[in-house]
Each structure stands twice: as C-alpha cells, then as structure tokens.
C-alpha cells in the first residue's frame, strides 16, 4: 500500500474521513472531521516527506468586536497568552492579527514519513485540535463565552478549502 492509501484507510477506519480535496500542490489532501463538525486537513505536500495536519479557525465576529473594544493592554496580554500557550503544545501556528485584534489562527503539526503510524497520526490530529480548542477557551475566558441562542457557531476552519 502507498502512504496515501494507508492514511486514507486509517482516517476512514476511525470515521473521520470526509473527502479528498483537489490540491495541485499536494500528493494528497484529505479533509477530515475531528471531532464531529470540526474540519481539519491532512496534507502531503508534493516532493516532501512530511504529512501536515492543520486546522484554521476564523474568530467569531462577536469576539472580534469585544476585542476591538478592549484596552491595548488587554489585547496585548491576550495575544501574548495565546502565543505562549500554543508553544506549550509544541505545534506550529500562525496568528492573523489586524490592529492588535485576532482575526484568524492556523494550527499545524508535521509527521515525517519515517515516523508515520496510525498512532502518530491520531496523536498529532488530537494535539492540533487541543491547541485550537485551547485558543477558543482563552477567547471565551478573556472576552466572554458566546454560547447563547443568538450566536451561531462558526465552523469556517478548513485550512485550505
């Protein structure tokens, strides 16, 4: 079997495989749901010996508004807390910030082919998800929990699609 077949089978076995995405820059690109309703990507870039697991998250407009109204000190502390906490997960990340307000963040981690096993794949998927979830918890802690009837969850969190 090929790496692509192995990875797809492992994802399907655990009922997280959603679809294969067209991606001219990748040998394969799978969109997964882990956990249910949380979109993530599993990608093998062309001519690389690595699998990238990633999750992008768009910050809810309500949180953006609350951040925009926060003091500069509160914004800076929040961004510092997000960065230091993400570093504890040993993941890579990119914060998209406009005027000291977090707009979006992308969390990724890699598995090199020589370390690719089903166990390594799912531990990495879980680590990326937990890092994303931690950012959501920090947002809710610092700027309020938006889980009410007037707020719809935002699931615009696919890294590439």
What residue ranges belong to the model's regions?
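Short, highly charged C-terminal tails/helix-capping segments
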Residues: 140-161
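Charge-rich, low-complexity N-terminal segments
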Residues: 1-50
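Solvent-exposed residues in well-ordered beta-strands and their adjoining turns
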Residues: 35, 56-58, 110-112
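Glycine-rich, often proline-containing surface loops adjacent to acidic residues and nearby aromatics
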Residues: 49-53, 100-113
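Short, well-structured hydrophobic secondary-structure segments
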Residues: 38-69
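Ampiphathic alpha-helical segments that act as solvent-exposed interaction surfaces
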Residues: 70-90, 113-146
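Short, internal acidic amphipathic alpha-helical interface segments
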Residues: 57-104
């Amino acid at each position: 079997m090929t790496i692509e077949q192995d990875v797809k089978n492992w994802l399907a076995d655990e009922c997280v495989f959603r679809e294969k995405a067209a991606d001219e820059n990748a040998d394969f690109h799978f969109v997964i749901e882990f956990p249910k309703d949380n979109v993530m990507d599993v990608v093998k870039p062309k001519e690389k010996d690595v699998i990238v697991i990633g999750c992008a998250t768009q910050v809810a407009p309500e949180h953006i508004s609350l951040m925009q109204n926060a003091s500069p000190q509160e914004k800076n502390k929040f961004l510092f807390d997000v960065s230091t906490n993400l570093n504890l997960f040993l993941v890579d990340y990119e914060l998209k910030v406009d005027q000291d307000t977090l707009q979006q963040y992308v969390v990724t981690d890699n598995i090199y082919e020589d370390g690719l096993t089903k166990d390594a794949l799912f531990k990495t998927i879980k680590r990326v998800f937990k890092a994303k979830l931690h950012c959501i918890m920090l947002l809710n802690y610092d700027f309020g929990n938006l889980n009410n009837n007037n707020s719809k969850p935002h699931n615009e969190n696919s890294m590439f699609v």
